Amino acid sequence: MSKNFLTNLDKSKRNKNVKVHEFFYSKSSNETTINFSKITYQFKNSTFGKTLIMNSDMGLCGLAFCDDLGKDAVLADMKLRWPKASYKQDTIFSDKEFRSILDKTKQVELCLLGSKFQIQVWKALLKIPTGKVTSYTTLAKYIGKPKAVRTIATAIGKNPLCWLIPCHRVLRANGELGGYHWG
């Protein structure tokens, strides 16, 4: 196994440039703890290609690569995550500000909406240092659910903030890509 492969996240430091606001929803009642009235979005070019960035009053709530799907499909997918919001396309960040967010040199507030389990997984992903990778199994053990590897993989696949929440740093135990969206 590579020296970059983490088998324990307990000693990892969380990215200090990220502040997380958590909002939960209940699958049984389809109710959320927050109701956004407006999300502003824009498409920016990045080293990863065309990128969708979404912002609410509480912070960034969406970051997605348009890759082969195209802008319309990616925007439609992200809108499903925030069904009660209204959307407006507008300039959110200058090119310089956007690069500083992707480079993680700018303080950024993230607004996460998901189940308590999903948010627990996404926050654990923030513990993986730049340049390191870990496995679904290690992540499952870290959050205290060692048998929930597939459920964790599903939560990772629903990560609304690719790159900032590093789902791409989680691999199968054998070091191969898992194939869950961007991770």
Residue ranges and their predicted role:
Residues K147-G183:
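Short glycine/serine-rich loop segments
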Residues M1-P146:
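Basic nucleic-acid-binding alpha-helical/helix-turn surface characteristic of O6-alkylguanine DNA
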